[in-house]
Amino acid sequence: MIVLGLGGDHLSIYLNDHVAAATAGASLARRAAASNKGTDYGSVLEAVANEIEEDRAALVDVMQRLSVGQDRLKTALAWGAEKAGRLKLNGQLLGYSPLSRLEEIEALSLGVEGKHALWQALRSTHGTDPRLAGVDLDDLIDRARSQRRRLEPLRTRAAEEALRQRSG
């Protein structure tokens, strides 16, 4: 089932907001991992990017189990917004800057925080729903916590590198 962004119950809107954010987040994570390949950041970002894609697939599975249609328009707009975000000035004319890295890792961290809240909300409202049998919400919550723990040192280091550097 495909929905067109209008109406819907709160659960449908909530899950569609999260799947749209997860789509943008997966794209951002892939880009951050590619931009940092071969650096101290690269392997962690690659692992987190893989997990974010798995988490998005888990969310789509949850939506299907709960008979919630995916709002393709909302998802496409979020994906497009992530792509447009690449056009933001980052302190240097060409290439990848320390500020780009910081902002990407911060955005990933915020996304992981939102995903953690999503899984907790689903556990508290639908944790015993037989339609979600086989979906390990506790595992998804733990994975979000793990992602947060792995991203935080990268975010701190990226902030030190980007914000201590003086341009001009």
Regions found by a protein language model. Give the residues of each.
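Long, hydrophobic, amphipathic alpha-helical segments used as structural scaffolds
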Residues: 33, 60-63, 67, 91, ...
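Alpha-helical bundle segments that constitute or directly flank the non-heme di-iron/ferroxidase center
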Residues: 6-37, 103-126
